[in-house]
């Protein structure tokens, strides 16, 4: 069996694709994959590090307002479709799956025009432009939030959840926090701002240092590589809390995730899939810079079920952040209730569900 996977730009599109690849390999040892992405996104380094063959194409996303740049984007899209058709004819895949980001536009569109079975996977509650466009041409649309189904042709929609959920649940044991310089047996908070970090979260963490020094819990604070030097310099000046460890990036995050009692971060789809699958309460700070403010919709779906505390970025400061963490951690009853609520929203068998969509498509294509 041969499968083409495409998705990129941010970790939220890439990591679900990798989790899906692992699931297919679990069922078919001889499967061959080709990952199509861009040179500029995070996908090239991440995918090649996993030893998966990678092909780069040149494509940019559409601006939501009319502009000359969109004319150039259309030209790149058409060129990308032509290039993808040639690559697909060469590779001869049994199916093509797009996991979001503008790069999968020409890939999945080209596959549909060649009559190759196609799936798109939408991680968010509000879909992006690329997946909305592709939904007209693909065979199946896999979703992770019920709210997303109204944006797609009803007969194509299948609720699968996010494959990353299955990946974190399947990890046996996990890694010890001592490897990161943290103590075992102590309540621990993970704070991070997504795959590229988030400056407003960093500012709030720096501002809460004096209060954090008085707490009996500990914090792992992942700044994002871009922000690391600036943050460590500010912490040195401010006086970092001794119960906090700072890292630029955590490559094996799924292997550590089970060890955390609370997660503080953005409301990206991958983060939500992981923490709900493991039943981890959270403080969610939706990014206001994403398409149609979809992270706030993601976050509210947890907040309304008492699985998370939702803080808007416009309201974020050091005091508000540490109060939100305290609300969860300093009352054992609240902590346990939120764990149960979070777990009830998880889809731990998401990767298998998505694999079953592929299997069914292949069966009907015969």
UniProtKB/Swiss-Prot annotation:
UDP-N-acetyl-alpha-D-glucosamine binds at residues 10-12, 124, 195, 295. This is UDP-N-acetylglucosamine--N-acetylmuramyl-(pentapeptide) pyrophosphoryl-undecaprenol N-acetylglucosamine transferase. Cell wall formation. Catalyzes the transfer of a GlcNAc subunit on undecaprenyl-pyrophosphoryl-MurNAc-pentapeptide (lipid intermediate I) to form undecaprenyl-pyrophosphoryl-MurNAc-(pentapeptide)GlcNAc (lipid intermediate II). The keyword Iron does not apply. GO terms for cellular component: plasma membrane. It comes from the Bacteria. It is an enzyme of class 2 (transferase). Its EC number is 2.4.1.227. Keywords: Cell cycle, Cell division, Cell membrane, Cell shape, Cell wall biogenesis/degradation, Glycosyltransferase, Membrane, Peptidoglycan synthesis, Transferase. CDD domains: GT28_MurG. Pfam families: Glyco_tran_28_C (PF04101), Glyco_transf_28 (PF03033). Gene3D superfamilies: Glycogen Phosphorylase B (3.40.50.2000). It is a peripheral membrane protein.
């Amino acid at each position: 069996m041969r499968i083409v996977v495409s998705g990129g730009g941010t970790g939220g599109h890439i990591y679900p694709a990798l989790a899906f690849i692992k699931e297919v390999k679990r069922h078919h040892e001889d499967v061959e994959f080709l990952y199509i992405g861009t040179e500029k996104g995070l996908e090239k380094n991440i995918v090649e590090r996993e030893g998966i063959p990678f092909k780069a194409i040149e494509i940019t996303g559409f601006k939501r307002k009319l502009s000359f740049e969109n004319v150039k984007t259309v030209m790149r899209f058409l060129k990308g479709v032509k290039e993808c058709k040639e690559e697909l004819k060469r590779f001869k895949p049994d199916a093509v799956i797009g996991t979001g980001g503008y790069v999968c536009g020409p890939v999945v569109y080209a596959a549909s025009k060649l009559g190759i079975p196609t799936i798109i996977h939408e991680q968010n509650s509000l879909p992006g432009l690329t997946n909305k466009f592709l939904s007209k041409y693909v065979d199946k649309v896999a979703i992770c939030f019920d709210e997303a189904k109204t944006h797609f042709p009803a007969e194509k929609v299948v609720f699968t959840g996010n494959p990353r959920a299955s990946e974190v649940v399947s990890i046996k044991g996990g890694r010890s926090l001592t490897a990161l310089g943290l103590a075992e047996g102590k309540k621990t908070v993970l704070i991070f701002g997504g795959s590229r970090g988030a400056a407003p979260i960093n500012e709030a963490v720096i501002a809460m240092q004096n209060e954090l020094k008085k707490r009996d819990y500990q914090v792992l604070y992942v700044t994002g590589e871009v922000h690391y030097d600036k943050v460590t310099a500010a912490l040195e000046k401010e006086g970092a809390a001794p119960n906090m460890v700072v890292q630029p990036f955590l490559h094996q995050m799924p292997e550590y995730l089970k060890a955390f009692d609370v997660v503080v971060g953005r409301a990206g789809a991958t983060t939500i899939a992981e923490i709900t699958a493991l039943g981890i309460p959270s403080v969610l700070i939706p990014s206001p810079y994403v398409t149609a403010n979809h992270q706030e919709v993601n976050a509210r779906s947890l907040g309304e079920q008492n699985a998370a505390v939702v803080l808007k970025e416009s309201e974020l400061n050091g005091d508000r952040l540490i109060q939100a963490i305290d609300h969860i951690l300093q009352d054992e009853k609240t902590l346990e209730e939120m764990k149960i609520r979070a777990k009830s929203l998880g889809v731990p068998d998401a990767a298998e569900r998505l694999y079953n969509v592929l299997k069914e498509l292949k069966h009907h294509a015969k």
